[in-house]
A protein has these predicted regions:
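Catalytic Cys-His active-site segments of thiol-dependent hydrolases/isopeptidases
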Residues: 415-420
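Aromatic-lined, polymer-binding surfaces characteristic
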Residues: 26-44, 48-279
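Flexible, surface-exposed loop/gating regions in the mature catalytic domains
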Residues: 164, 178, 182, 352-353, ...
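Active-site-proximal structural scaffolding
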Residues: 118, 122, 182, 245-248, ...
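Bacterial Sec-dependent N-terminal signal peptides
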Residues: 1-22
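Carbohydrate-active enzyme catalytic cores, enriched for enzymes
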Residues: 172, 196, 239, 243-414, ...
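CBM-like, beta-strand-rich accessory domains located in the C-terminal region of large
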Residues: 19-21, 421-759
Length: 759
């Protein structure tokens, strides 16, 4: 009997210890004792943190007087930093009053069928409530904790997790709402559930279900029937625009950190996409003097940054130096929702930036093929030049901008995106979302069908074959699908050589009509003969249309009836406080097939006079340019037979003594020498380049190639096929060969270098 009693007592003790182990030791979600201690230590020798603390304390003191629910995060942080019970009592009072509400639902959302009981406003309230409850937990009585917990479950936890995750009440799927709303609603509801589980053991199972489901959000592969995009690109990043990508990722990471903090010693599992996010956020940013800018493709603004996600990644153990570099570029307060030093999360989670590198160790170009973005830059230094191209999905936050582009130069988006505004405003659906707000080609005044905002584009756009050889870069945009109601070909090539971006449009439509090129510029626009100069401070570019026609030389366009004429179009500014002008270059002729070639000359200074000289040249089945600048000559050829007009015959042309089937190629050589002796080539979609019975390049399948030879070293950049057997002419055996920045063995025979590649 005695042994039985002892056994029962031991069992009860073990059970009690197990139950205690399952309980959360508040505070432990995000404002942890460890974080508080670390920031106190850093404040002793970091004046910026001291200044930020003063701002936070001031905000908290104002909230203390007003009993401001929306400043629960400030009150919580100040209480945990000072241990002044006055702040904790205010938190308790605010929460006790908050749970008296009948509902935190939104009237418009509740009117939907089925009713949406939760939305972003509720998600934010959930976060604030969780932080406050976690901070003030130990000053509440057990009855107060229970009352608040039950109220918050009714108002937020059950509606959020019930709508987005739990059976049998779930109404959303990843296919219908699997973007930033999903992580915000379910993860903030999950953080709140984490904070309440001591009083409400039943929510623990909900939390664990969310934890198990979160990787599924990152892995969502899209679908065919509803044309939903794959959420995360293989190279990192999310298609929704930087603004919403950062927001959705941030919300997910907040929950993951809170889960880890409340589950010490437990393995959270791997989410492989996280490791690629620092590169993504950096590749779509533009470092400059002043605040960091980022791509504003879709529903984002150029001042939006992703320091919040970067900080949370760093806290999760992704100790990539790129994160430190990125955060160091962000200007305090540069956008509405940031994690800045004088805001609680930024105060606690901004890492020590003293070891941030001057520039990131990243490639200067990046292709995000899954969602159709590409960036190319000449340097990671501030105020460099960056070209960004978009041709991917259209739907929701992703605009009708297939084949559009942005040019940042000398600190300014000198060729810009039209922007966006608040969605209920008619200007959003009538202008900002539509093709007219982007740098694209219209046919008979039409771009992508307007209904794609809601229905999406069944046929998406694509980007292909990015090559980066330093002073020569290339990417191909295929925007045919989104405009296939009018176009059978809508290809746009971007060939960046030295200080000129050449934009080549290959266009064919189902019927005869008129083409126009749209230009959204950010600066003083001045037409000078056949050129347009755009200048903003130290940033200046020349826009020079070369094919199909030059820009009419003067305002007397009737004297140049075949040349491009221009139209000024007024459109709303992003802030909706006024209007701005964008420009359309019209081709007067009515045709159904055209090649467009426009040079964007990147000026070193607004007053630079030594610009490239460009001579238009044509021959049998080809058009092109001869470019002379600073002692170098570049011949650019565009093959008129290689645009799909031939079915089974190959597209051979013979320009200036060359023989090739390439869609386009360029050869560069010092002025005063012969093209035949050139060592630098660009070949676009070609299988051979020959001259005087010599083979300069050969491949059984057509490839995209940049070739540079210098100091007995041959560098090649090649794309186009998974298996490649190619040969390249070199007069002498090179001592070193690199292909796509990787050294390979030198296999050389009779002036031919053999290259074998397998993906």
């Amino acid at each position: 009997m005695k042994q039985t009693i002892i056994a029962v007592i031991c069992f009860l003790c073990v059970s009690s210890l197990y139950i205690q182990a399952q309980k959360i030791n508040h505070p432990s979600l995000l404002y942890t004792p460890q974080r508080i201690q670390q920031v106190k230590q850093r404040m002793q020798h970091e004046p910026k943190l001291q200044e930020a603390w003063g701002d936070i304390k001031k905000t908290a003191d104002e909230a203390l007087q007003k009993k401001d629910f929306n400043r629960l995060d400030y009150l919580s942080l100040v209480y945990l930093m000072t241990d002044n019970k006055e702040y904790a009592d205010a938190i308790k009072e605010i929460l006790l009053k908050a749970v008296e509400a009948e509902s935190w639902g939104d009237v418009e959302m509740m009117a939907r069928i089925p009713a949406w009981r939760s939305q972003l406003g509720m998600a934010h309230k959930s976060f604030l409530s969780a932080v406050g409850y976690d901070a003030a937990y130990n000053v509440m009585s057990s009855s107060e904790r229970k009352k608040i917990a039950e109220g918050l479950k009714r108002l937020a936890v059950e509606p959020a997790l019930g709508d987005w995750l739990l059976e049998p009440t779930r109404i959303h799927s990843l296919n219908s709402m699997g973007h930033n709303w999903w992580t915000s609603c379910v993860c903030q509801g999950g953080i709140l559930a984490l904070s309440l589980q001591n009083e409400l053991p039943e929510v623990k199972e909900w939390v664990e279900q969310l934890h198990e489901s979160l990787p599924e959000w990152f892995d969502f592969a899209g679908d065919v029937l509803q044309q939903k995009a794959k959420s995360f690109d293989e190279a990192g990043g999310m298609y929704e625009s930087l603004n919403y990508a950062n927001f959705g990722i941030q919300e997910a990471l907040l929950f993951r950190i809170a889960w880890i903090n409340t589950h010490p010693g437990q393995n959270p599992g791997d989410i492989p996409q996280l490791a690629k996010l620092p590169s993504y956020f950096s590749q779509v940013c533009y470092p400059r003097t002043g605040m960091l800018h980022s791509l504003n493709l879709g529903d984002s603004h150029k001042n939006v940054s992703a320091e919040s996600s970067m900080m949370l990644l760093y806290a999760l153990g992704v100790k990539d130096p790129t994160i430190l570099w990125y955060i160091a570029q962000v200007e305090q307060g540069q956008h509405r929702d940031g994690f800045f030093l004088n805001r609680p999360m930024g105060f606690l989670y901004t890492p020590d930036l003293s070891k941030a590198p001057a520039v990131p160790q990243l490639p200067t170009s990046q292709l995000f093929a899954d969602f159709g973005w590409a960036t190319m830059r000449n340097s990671w230094e501030k105020d460099a030049t960056m070209l960004a191209v978009k041709s991917g999905h259209t739907w929701n936050h992703s605009h009708a901008d297939a084949n559009s582009f942005i040019v940042f130069h000398k600190g300014v988006d000198i060729i810009k995106d039209g922007g966006n505004c608040w969605y209920p405003n008619p200007a959003y659906r009538n202008y900002f979302f539509q093709s007219q707000a982007h740098n694209v080609v219209l046919f008979n005044g039409e771009g992508q069908p307007r209904e794609q905002q809601y229905s999406g584009s069944t046929l998406r756009g694509y980007l292909h074959h990015l090559l980066d050889a330093g002073n020569v870069k290339y990417v191909l945009a295929n925007g045919t699908g989104p405009v296939s109601n009018n176009f059978s070909r809508n290809f746009r090539h971007f060939l960046w050589m030295d200080n000129v971006i050449y934009m080549i449009d290959d266009l064919k439509t189902h019927k005869i009509g008129q083409f126009e090129w749209l230009w959204h510029t950010n600066g003083t626009y001045k037409k000078s003969g056949v050129d347009v100069n755009v200048t903003n401070g130290n940033s200046s570019v020349v826009i020079r249309p070369l094919y199909p026609r030059l820009l009419a030389k003067s305002d007397f366009v009737h004297d140049y009836p075949e040349d491009l004429y221009w139209e000024k179009i007024e459109a709303p500014t992003e802030d909706l406080k006024g209007t701005e002008t964008y420009y359309s270059f019209h081709l007067p002729a009515e045709v159904n097939r055209v090649k467009g070639l426009t040079a964007i000359i990147l000026k070193e200074t607004p007053n630079e006079k030594d610009l490239p000289q460009m001579e238009r040249r044509e021959g049998q089945d080809w058009i092109g340019l001869r470019i002379r600048h600073k002692g170098k000559v570049t011949d650019l050829y565009i093959n008129q037979l290689a645009d799909g007009r031939l079915m089974h015959s190959n597209s051979w042309i013979m320009p200036d003594g060359w023989m090739t089937d390439a869609y386009m190629f360029a050869v560069s050589y010092p002025e005063g020498t012969e093209a035949a002796d050139a060592k630098d080539f660009f070949i676009c979609h070609g299988s051979a380049l020959r001259r005087d019975k010599e083979t300069y390049f050969s491949s059984l399948s057509k490839l995209f190639v940049i070739q540079k030879e210098e100091d007995k070293k041959l560098n090649l950049w090649i794309d186009g096929q998974p298996k490649i057997n190619a040969s390249f002419r070199s007069k002498k055996k090179p001592i070193r060969v690199e292909v796509n920045n990787k050294r390979i063995p030198v296999v050389y025979k009779q002036s031919q270098l053999s290259i074998k590649l397998v993906d």
